[in-house]
Amino acid sequence: GLAERAELGGVCLNWGCIPTKSLLHTADVMREAMAASELGLEIDKPRFNLKKVVKRSRDVAAQLSGGVSHLMRKNKITIFAGDAIFQNKNTVTVGDDTIIADNIIVATGARARNLPHIQVDGDRIWDARSAMTPTFMPKKLLIIGAGAIGVEFASFYNTLGAKVTLVEVMDQILPAEDSEIADLAKQSFVNQGMEVLTATGVDEVKVTGKTLTATIDGKSRKFDAAILSVGVSGNVEDLGLEAIGVEIERGFISVDEYQQTSVDGVYAIGDVAGVPCLAHKASHEGIIAVEGIVGEMPHPLNKERIPGCTYSHPQVASIGLSEVQAGERGEIKVGRFPLLANGKAVAVNDTEGLVKTIFDASTGALLGAHMIGPGVTEMIQGFAVAIGLETTESELMETIFPHPTLSEAMHESVLSAYGRTINF
């Protein structure tokens, strides 16, 4: 059985990964239309219909949520609509229903964090849900937090014409990414007309009518709206977890390498089980938990082998260790290849980007790969397979990449790490 209090498919499908990709695709098409004259196409200045843009995004989410419902019926899984509460480690109640099970998996996800001095109101101060369903296009938009979510919204709203100010308290935007890639992303966003402030805090936000006044490093600034994207907290409350002894640390459920909590037979997966808060990590954790329950021998999750993607323009994708992290473990070799030297990138008029690879100098093991540019969110899986199979630098160098493709930049980056670059 499955207990769910909202839409099937969770945050990712309904209010996260999927609907935002619809919005960002709209922005990508608009950006290409604006640059069409460079390709010999004469197109009047494109305009957007905000209601239609939002409606398509919601329709996509609804279609896929319906698909999950179909899968539940097809596999004869009983749905209990409502909040599940533990009565003991083998029993939960959902409304008037009592469900007894030998094993229970908690997959309650996470919710956006507020800041003590900034509270989302849905009108002028938005969380991700409000930012996905705007009723107006702000002329001036403040985005607080420049992780993947903040950066994606910055790309969307900037492309559709808002003047975006992106503020991050850390020293770099995209704090989870390699600093060189993050710096390239920041420079690109600035070149696109955004204001990007790092190592900067937002001290106060006040709303007066249709105007929002923010105090940024002591200076008062006016905006039409703000998006708060400063991380998430696990949905651990009101489940009865404490009563049965499940250990919770810093707002997330503690689990072992097989997703087992501190209580035998109770598992946790996904965002509620801690970072990184990524849907593909959640799915894999679900498989690990179920394989363990049915007596198979699952491989534990290796968090250094989880790819991460940011669907901004330019896109960012990575897997493994950053250059700094890898360097702390020993001697490394680093390869770099700019997309400016890639034939396919030149042909499709999208040459902004870099592929960076990091190897263990003694073993040739691929420790990390970091990419920025067109299509990199689709290409990163090649490096994910390589790391998963523990491929060496020589095996990667001997691999034939098709021409002309953007993926050739991956090959050239590997060659670069060993001084064998061909096209740069």
Which residues does each predicted region cover?
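A Rossmann-like FAD-binding core segment of flavoenzymes
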Residues: 78-81, 85-93, 99, 161-257, ...
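Glycine-rich Rossmann-fold phosphate-binding loop(s) that bind the pyrophosphate
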Residues: 5-6, 144-147, 271, 275
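Glycine-rich dinucleotide-binding loop and its adjacent helix/turn
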Residues: 17, 108-167, 195-196, 242-244, ...
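Flexible, glycine-rich terminal cap/loop adjacent to redox cofactors
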Residues: 3-6, 18, 22-32, 294-295, ...
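A short alpha-helix-loop-beta-strand transition element characteristic
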Residues: 30-48, 111-113, 247-249, 296-305, ...
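FAD-site-proximal beta/loop scaffold in flavoenzymes
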Residues: 118-137, 220-300
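Rossmann-like dinucleotide-binding cores of NAD(P)H-dependent redox enzymes
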Residues: 54, 59-69, 133, 138-142, ...
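N-terminal Rossmann-like dinucleotide/flavin-binding domain of flavoprotein oxidoreductases
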Residues: 14-15, 19-98, 177-203, 208, ...
